[in-house]
């Protein structure tokens, strides 16, 4: 019996919400020999890629990168910002919001789910009421998935931010942008997001395996008192490294790909990229 794999018949097109199809130029950018991650050539690639991701996030805050899927960035956000027994609110929007909540429970956090119909999305008034009732400020963080891959539900992050502000509550605001970044308008600094969870395999057009968190100054201050156990994802350790984003070996080929993907976004124009996704999404719905 032959063990030879059959040759693909034409170009493989992946009709899936993610991972997504990877542009040829991104694949070609990654097709190169390995390089020392301290080599000046790679440091320039790294810096260009990070600056490009900040542009897409619309932020000036610090980014931490991981050799991990989005689940790794989820875990990094929780363990670097919170302590055992901390109470958090998770806004239900579908499978992945529930999985993030389950991960938080696994780390010993007190998770309160703001329940919602997966077809209609969160009731912002319910969040406002929950925070208003929390006079002791026991809630340490609010977690939301910007775009729920499983249901296609998009949450109004700006409205959620306004609801938190209206109550004067000091809770951190954590947002998962894994399936929205580079496809939907997202403004980390303007919307005062304390921790953004992102991944490369969707709007950033990379293979799976790279994720990251963007962290505000308020988030970094909370990190200094967070007591959940961590090591590989520890931001304090990362900040001591030359590239200030990794523990262990950097995935150099992925950064070459990321440099090309953010170049493609800048070439088309971020607003044009978002408008294109908006048109295609509406065409799909109709």
Annotate the PLM regions.
Residues 189-201:
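Conserved active-site segment immediately N-terminal to the catalytic lysine
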Residues 60-89, 93, 97-102:
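Conserved beta-loop-alpha segment that forms the PLP phosphate-binding cup at the N-terminus of a helix
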Residues 21-22, 201-285:
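Active-site C-terminal subdomain of aminotransferase-like
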Residues 122-182:
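Active-site phosphate-binding strand-loop segment of PLP-dependent enzymes
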Residues 1-10:
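Basic/polar N-terminal segments that are highly enriched at the extreme N-terminus
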Residues 11-67, 71:
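A glycine-/small-polar-enriched, mobile loop at the entrance of the PLP active site in fold-type I
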Residues 90-134, 145-154:
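Gly/Ser-rich phosphate-binding catalytic loop and adjacent alpha/beta segment
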């Amino acid at each position: 019996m032959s063990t030879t794999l059959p040759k693909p018949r034409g170009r493989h097109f992946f009709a899936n919400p993610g991972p997504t199809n990877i542009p040829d130029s991104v694949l070609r950018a990654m097709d190169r020999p390995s390089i020392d991650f301290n080599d000046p050539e790679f440091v320039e690639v790294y810096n260009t890629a990070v600056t490009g991701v900040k542009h897409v996030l619309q932020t000036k805050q610090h980014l931490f990168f991981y050799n991990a899927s989005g689940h790794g960035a989820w875990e990094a956000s929780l363990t670097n910002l919170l302590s055992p027994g901390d109470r958090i609110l998770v806004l239900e929007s579908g499978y992945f919001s529930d999985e993030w909540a389950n991960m938080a429970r696994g780390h010993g956090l007190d998770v309160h789910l703001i329940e919602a119909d997966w077809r209609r999305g969160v009731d912002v008034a319910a969040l406002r009421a929950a925070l208003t009732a929390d006079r002791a400020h026991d809630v340490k963080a609010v977690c939301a998935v910007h775009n729920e891959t499983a249901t296609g539900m998009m949450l109004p992050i700006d409205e959620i931010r306004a609801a938190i502000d209206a109550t004067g509550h000091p809770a951190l605001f954590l947002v998962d942008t894994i399936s929205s970044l580079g496809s939907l308008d997202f403004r980390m600094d303007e919307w005062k997001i304390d921790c953004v969870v992102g991944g490369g395999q969707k709007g950033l057009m990379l293979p799976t395996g790279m994720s990251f968190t963007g962290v505000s100054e308020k988030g970094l201050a909370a990190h200094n008192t967070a007591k959940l156990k961590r090591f590989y994802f520890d931001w304090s350790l990362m900040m001591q490294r030359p590239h200030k984003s990794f523990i262990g070996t950097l995935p150099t080929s992925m950064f070459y790909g990321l440099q090309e993907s953010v170049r493609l976004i800048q070439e088309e124009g971020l607003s044009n990229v978002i408008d294109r996704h908006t048109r295609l999404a509406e065409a799909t719905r109709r």
